[in-house]
């Protein structure tokens, strides 16, 4: 089953996307991550394409949340580092590699949440990560990595609280 995430025209969002990309790249540099160039159009296409899992997070959700935009920039950057083109079918065509990029992005996102001391966000995303273990599309070889992320950030949350 595939689902297409909510669509808002590129023209309506391009300026906002550009501003948010700039802000996220600064945040990522502070976290020690050197992102690949991500154009506003690539970001838009990636965020509005179909997903095999029925993802319900929309481009608006991401633009409204600094943690999610950091996540998506890392995810797209990691895919580009693997030589994967970013377009409206990337997630469907390369979904096993997307999971690898997704986990790297999750680590940066949650490091940023720890840095910001946003423990509520950490709890939300740790719960999301638990559900990823039940995802039928998750490649089996990535289950240990998902568990390691859960362990690391659950322990980090306990230390901070």
Predicted regions and their residues:
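Active-site recognition of the HExxH zinc-binding catalytic motif
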Residues: 67-80
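Metalloprotease/metallohydrolase-associated module, dominated by Zn2+-dependent proteases
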Residues: 2-42, 48-49, 57-63, 86-161
